[in-house]
Amino acid sequence: LQTPAKWLTWINAGILLSFWGIMYAFGDAGLWMDISHNAVRKLDLFLFGESHLYHGNVVNGVRIAFDPEGFLSTLPAISTCLFGYQVSLYLENQAKENKSALLGLLGWGSTLIIIALIWDQAFPVNKKLWTSSFVLLCAGIDFILIGLLNWWIETKERHFGNTFFLVLGTNSILAYGISEIIAIQLGKYQIQGQSGSDWLYWHIFEPIFGKYNGSLAYAITFVLVCWGVCWVFWRKKWFLKV
């Protein structure tokens, strides 16, 4: 954070390119993006051992040890953090000069998305590995959304509907914790030989909404449940902070 702002872009580029090189060099030849043979899993197995890793992924009928966003993925995660820091600096500077941040963020966001989609051909977008192309894609989308929201809320001073997002934003730690608790408990709870989450999808959401829309409906419902808990805290003025 003490680094001059003008160097952050180069630091970000260095981190993302280095992660790409590490993944390619230390993953198994031809399988460096495979769930069983990637460098992220290899390092986690070396550092923590198989018994201390998450066993939520099934390969050939067997649950394997693999932590999504493992220790090595901290590198690109730092880059994600730096992108957020860069946006905050940009918004601050634009506010001081009384300028709109919309066009700048739309331009940068679009550029990052284009780079991500091109890079995806060589280093695929993958959330579980937090790949460099995934970082750029998410940053690009976020830049555009932040630009639009900043323009709508700060420049146009439109506040209708903001409370819905404030409920989650002011208690983001609680929202994350609730989502993890629900996901873990649904995964443990068995109904007719299926996990609770699988049963809900296949018996409620998929029959009503179809395959893809059912998945979307499940995700939206999950978010709304978490929002409901956060809303209770919002009404009580209870906020969890670090």
Language model segments and positions:
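Alpha-helical transmembrane segments and their immediate juxtamembrane cytosolic regions
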Residues: 1-242
